[in-house]
Every structure is written in C-alpha cells, then in structure tokens.
Amino acid sequence: MLSESLFKSLGHLASHGHLHDAFKTFSLLRLQSSSAVSDDLVLHSAASLLSACVDVRAFLAGVQVHAHCISSGVEYHSVLVPKLVTFYSAFNLHNEAQSIIENSDILHPLPWNVLIASYAKNELFEEVIAAYKRMVSKGIRPDAFTYPSVLKACGETLDVAFGRVVHGSIEVSSYKSSLYVCNALISMYKRFRNMGIARRLFDRMFERDAVSWNAVINCYASEGMWSEAFELFDKMWFSGVEVSVITWNIISGGCLQTGNYVGALGLISRMRNFPTSLDPVAMIIGLKACSLIGAIRLGKEIHGLAIHSSYDGIDNVRNTLITMYSKCKDLRHALIVFRQTEENSLCTWNSIISGYAQLNKSEEASHLLREMLVAGFQPNSITLASILPLCARIANLQHGKEFHCYILRRKCFKDYTMLWNSLVDVYAKSGKIVAAKQVSDLMSKRDEVTYTSLIDGYGNQGEGGVALALFKEMTRSGIKPDHVTVVAVLSACSHSKLVHEGERLFMKMQCEYGIRPCLQHFSCMVDLYGRAGFLAKAKDIIHNMPYKPSGATWATLLNACHIHGNTQIGKWAAEKLLEMKPENPGYYVLIANMYAAAGSWSKLAEVRTIMRDLGVKKDPGCAWIDTDSGFSLFSVGDTSSPEACNTYPLLDGLNQLMKDNAGYAINKVQSSDEELLQEMG
C-alpha cells in the first residue's frame, strides 16, 4: 500500500536527519489517511518526527508536530506522550513535559522515567524527588529505570530518610536484584558514607559488572579505607571483570596517598599493557610518584607517552611534568617544558618558580618571578608560599620585606596563617628576631609553626631563655608542639648552654607531648653536651641511642672534642666518621684537625690519601651581604674586590672577637681549615 510505503520512507528520512523531506512525506501521508490503519500510521509517523526533531535540535518543527497532535485530538495518546515528554525534556522545558504527563491517563512509568531522568541529567535533584512522589501518588509503580535516577537524587541531596524509603520500596519489589538498581543503591550509600550497607548490598549481588566493582571500591577510597579498596581491586582483577581506567586511577591514586609510590608506579606500568592505556589522570599520578622517589627515567617515559597522546598540552599534565623534573633536580628539562607553551597559566608559573625555589636557585627564581609579573600575573598564595621559604633559607631580607608589603596591601591574605608563618621565618632567619616577634604578635592565629620559627630564631641569637619562655607560652595556649618544635627548643638550649633545661625537655618529650625522640633529637643532645664540655655524656648518648649515628652526629661530637681539646674521644669519633666515607669535605677537615691535634701523623696522612682517592675537594666558602646598593658576594681568598684592603682587616678583627667571646682557647698547633685543605690539595 502507498500509505505503508510512505510511512517506511518517512521513518528512513527521519532516522537519517533529513527532516525537511520527512515533513514533506508526512504531509503526503496525511492526505492518504482514510482509514483506521492509516490514522495509526500517521500517529507513529508523528512520533518518528518528534524523535528526529530531538536528534537535530529542531525545536520549532517539533512544536508544529505537537500542534498537529493537538488539532487531531491525539496529544495524550500512549504512543505520543512519551515522545512529547522526551521532546520537551530535551529542550529543558520540564514544566511543559510534566503538564503533558499530568493531563494524560497513562499509568505506565515510561513518560515519568523520561521526565525524572531529564531532571537528574540537569542536576535538578529536588525536582526528581518531587516527580517521583507525584508518580507514586498517581498509583504508577516505579520500575528498574525509575529507581537509579531517584537514588542518585537522594544521594546528591543527602536525603537519607527518603533514600531509605525508596530503598524499602525496592526491597519489596521485583527489582531488588536488578544490576542497575543495586549499583545505584551502592552509589547512594557511598554518598551517605554508610559503608556497611553499601558492602552488604555488593556482597549479595548475583551479578556484578565493572560499575558495581567501581562503586564499592570508590566507596572505600572516598573514606580512605585503602586496605579494603586494594583487597577488592585484587578480587575484581581475578574475577575477570574488565578494569576501567577509572578503577586503575582510584587504586594507583590510593597507593600514592598511602605512600606506596613504587606500588603506584607498578599499577601505572601495568595499565600501559592493557587497552585502557593511560589517561591524563593516570599520567599525573605516575608523574607525582616519580617526583616523590626521584624516578626520573620512568618520568621521562611517561612524558614521552604524554607527547604521543597529545596530553602534554593539558595544563595539569604540564605542571606535573615541571614539578617532576624539578623534584628530580633536572631544572633544565623543567624549563624546557615550561618554555614550550607560549601562554602559561598562573599554575604553570608557580610550578616552575617553586622548582627553582626548592633547589635554592634564588637568582633564577627571582628572574622568573619578574617575568611572571611582566606577563601580567600577580603572585597568589601558592607563589608566595614558594618564594618566602627561599628568602628565609638564604636570609634574603630585602625580598622578604617586599613580599611583606605585598601581603599587607592585599586583604585576601589576611587569614593565610601559612604566609604569615613564612614571614616570621624570614625575619627570624635573617637575624631580625624583634621584627619576627612583631609580625607574630599581629597574627590573628598562631600555630606550632609560628612558635617554632620564633624559638629557632631566638635560639640562634643565643637567647635560650626567651626561647624557653616562648615554648611555655605555646604549650599553655593549648598548642601542641611537634618534633620540629622540640628540635628547635633543644637547639636553643644547646646554643645557650642550658644543659639542665634541655635534659628535662628531652626526658619528658614522649610522656608529656607524645613525641618519640628521633635521630635529630639525639643529635641535639650530643650538641648540647658537647658545647657545654660534657663530652663523656655526649659519647654515652651516641652509645645508647636506638639509631645509627649519622655523619652529622659524629661531626658534632668531633667538633666539640676539637673545641675542648679532648683528643681521646675525638680520635674515636674521627675513626667512626672516617669509616662512613662521607661526601662532605668539611668532615674530612674536622678529622684532619683532630689527628693533627692528637699528633697522629700517620692517620693524618691516611686522611689525605682518602681525600685524594675520593676526589674530595672543598669549594671555597662564600657569603653575601645585602646593602642598599644590592648584594655583595664574598669568597674565601678573593682579593679582586676594590674593598679587599678594608675587608680583610675587618674580618680578622671579627674572627678575633668571636674567639675571645667563645669561652675557650684556640690550639695554636692546629692549622686552619683552609690551610689543611691547601696541604691536602
């Protein structure tokens, strides 16, 4: 029949997006309608046209079809209602869609499912729940396509009470074993942070797909329950279910968070052998793991994959690449990655500046910061958090003051305790302890970092009493010290020879503050006793501590013996330090000085031979001073400066002043460090 032929032709045209020709065919079909059969064909043709209007986003054409349906009196026909609801929902005209459903007599859940799914897609979760309640009130029973959207809405709105109501209706329905419904239930309880119910639902499922496994693994991951997540991942792997890239990323990210960096890289390597391959998230996880363990070779491999996949242009990937190279001390490649992009974001600028700052490349970091300003970017809290610690480490007071002014001019930094702590540290490490205290007094909130910087600053100035008073103020304020704070206090006691105070803190640090002494704390005690001349006690500390002494610990004891003229313990410390074959050339100078003082010339010759064989060479010492005209650099033995004739007599005077105030006599037999190095060279 001609009508059937036109109907088939219309369906073909509509499904292939030829809307204009489909409408022409529809007009011909209407002219041919003269029986009940042809009316039915017209009805289904209108339904096909509405679907085509959705596909090609032809709103006005769809409205014309709707108008025809109204004029024909078939607007609420069971064939057309779902199509009309789909049409209006596709254009986010949900009121029109719901009005059509409400005015129809259809008791099938399909049109409601379409409306509810559209609400959920547009994140109108309150409307999802309202539509579901209206649907149930009309006596329409939900089906397996209704529940997932409603459960998602309950989870997103954290409507625990109604979520349980919906769950209850599922339990008494035939859909309690539906794969999609169970997956939605697990996801909802994940949002409710109810791991118990989520896991029970998962365990009772007869059928599980990748979504099921991902949902419950993600539940555990979101709660930081990584051992359970890892266990389920292994079970998923052995069950034969295809592991999606999302699951790989969740588990490898979990390894990263729990400190299992090698495990994270192992998972990333396994991903490369599967069809999932690496996506940008996986690459970022892998690069972060590489940066944390210094695996630059694998980092370069991931970089190559990023280039091959065109992911290296993604901002987050590029920033992580810069960080990886910086952490692996390969600033050349970090800068190459940075320079490859013409327009860098503020995050990218922060990444490269942070890389140079962490490696104490102050000149390069300052130059990059100036470049960033010229490019029109203003430093944010992350920029300042990178630069200020560098200013503190190199005692760059001038730059610290400039950043202080920058912070003061911007109210947005008022409550950034981390930045104010960094400023306190800059002033303290630059010797401006009064200014550091003034900055801390103006802070709205102080924490253990604030007090640690002040204690360390006063300790280095020889103000051990003030440092102890600050420590008491800190603990009385309810601020709990950490292990770094205790190191600062012990160091302050050491510099001021407050032996009894240091002993008391060391004895009670675990029982009173819950801080177990680590190697740093024991080394501080060695320094405390050594500076005070209690060398036997310092030796006992090393003998009895539960850690293997580091080169720095032996050097501390050795230097104390050198100062106080105790060659017996000094020779013992020198031998122990020499056994470690340290890379620090200054340690060999200490050892050589001790053997020279003890008259052990054969040992001294042995030290010289070891230094020569290992190629140990001490770089000339250098320092700099910040003046109004900029930084002036001083190097050992440098006479090129026009001020050298004035500088060296002043330096000799300062050296003598330090010796006079040190409280001990200089052994005239021993050579200076530089003289010994010249003899060994």
Curated annotation (Swiss-Prot):
PPR repeats lie at residues 108-142, 143-177, 178-208, 209-243, 244-278, 279-313, 314-344, 345-379, 380-414, 416-446, 447-481, 482-517, 518-548. Keywords: Repeat. The keyword Repeat applies. Gene3D superfamilies: Tetratricopeptide repeat domain. PROSITE patterns: PPR (PS51375). Residues 553-628 are annotated as: Type E motif. One of its GO terms (molecular function) is RNA binding. GO terms for biological process: RNA modification. Residues 629-659 are annotated as: Type E(+) motif. It holds the Pfam family E_motif. The keyword Repeat applies. Belongs to the PPR family. PCMP-E subfamily. This is Pentatricopeptide repeat-containing protein At1g71490. It comes from Arabidopsis thaliana. The lineage of its organism: Eukaryota, Viridiplantae, Streptophyta, Embryophyta, Tracheophyta.
